[in-house]
A protein has these predicted regions:
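C-terminal catalytic domain of Rieske-type non-heme iron oxygenases
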Residues: 49, 54-275
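Rieske [2Fe-2S] iron-sulfur-binding domain
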Residues: 1-61, 67-72
Length: 275
């Protein structure tokens, strides 16, 4: 737990120590233990890869690599230079609903009309949102700016086109790797499901490393944190109601709107995993 920079990992129980490669380098009071071979006690290797600066770990050694599955997705966002991001601040929440409630809420703008009438809806009209076709385990929600002539709040990364700098994007690599992207700022929603009816959430505010040199960097981070919190508080109230409805005895399946195409895409992916 926590964040560290160490050359050895030491178990707090019996003080066995391992190097960063997972090799056992110290095992106190093991002299005389018959058949004890330190080389046979190395830590197991967890499969991992680095994608656009994110370290992805997978306990299933048989799963296909991540990057080839999201090549089109990666090209869609290549101008945003995701690998240049740093985590400027992290917001933490606990929620009493299934993680899929959050993902579905994140990936459609239809609810802007009712949930965000004074925040998102005036800036990104629900009716203008669109979801491109997907060729892999991912989905992208593109929300064009309702005010395309207004300048960007933050200086955009070099090479970003005007529409990329002003429009808002939500994306998911299934099942729940969520990124909210606008210009130079990215919100990474990191989900930790705790069961069918709860999750922990960390919202990481990510900004380009070069923006850290700005004199008003702290104000930028604070302003982003306040806005992200305000939006999420609006979503919390909505998701609480959604969960109450989903767990009610008379709940049935409704019809998706064309604006909820991303949810449909996730459902198709889910069906593929189940067959």
């Amino acid at each position: 737990e926590g964040t560290w920079n160490r050359k050895l990992f030491t178990c707090p129980y019996h003080s066995w120590s391992y190097d960063t490669g997972g090799a056992l380098v110290r095992a106190p009071v093991m002299e005389g233990a018959e058949g004890f071979d330190p080389a046979a006690c190395n830590l197991p290797e967890i499969r991992s890869e680095v994608w656009e600066g994110f370290i992805l770990a997978n306990l299933d050694a048989g799963t296909a690599p991540f990057a080839p599955q999201v090549e089109t997705y990666t090209r869609y966002f290549e101008n945003f230079r995701l690998a240049d991001l740093i985590v400027a601040r992290t917001l933490e929440f606990e929620h009493g609903w299934n993680w899929k409630v959050l993902v579905e809420n994140f990936m459609e703008a239809y609810h802007h009309i009712g949930v965000h009438p004074e925040t998102f809806e005036p800036a990104f009209h629900a009716r203008d949102s669109r979801v491109p076709e997907s060729d892999g385990p991912w989905s992208i929600l593109h929300m064009p700016s309702a005010h395309p002539d207004e300048p960007s709040i933050l200086p955009p990364p070099p090479g970003l086109e005007d529409w990329q700098a002003r429009d808002l994007f939500a994306s998911v690599a299934f099942p729940h790797f969520l990124l909210g992207i606008q210009g130079a700022s990215v919100l990474w929603y990191q989900l930790f499901p705790k069961g069918p009816d709860g999750l922990s959430l960390k919202i990481h505010i990510c900004l380009p490393f070069w923006l850290k040199e700005a004199e008003d960097f702290d104000e930028i981070v604070e302003g982003t944190a306040q806005f992200a919190t305000a939006i999420h508080m609006e979503d919390i109230a909505a998701n609480d109601s959604v969960w109450a409805g989903l767990t009610a005895p008379m709940t049935g399946q409704g019809r998706l709107s064309p604006l909820e195409k991303s949810i449909w895409q996730m459902n198709q992916w889910w069906l593929d995993q189940m067959t």
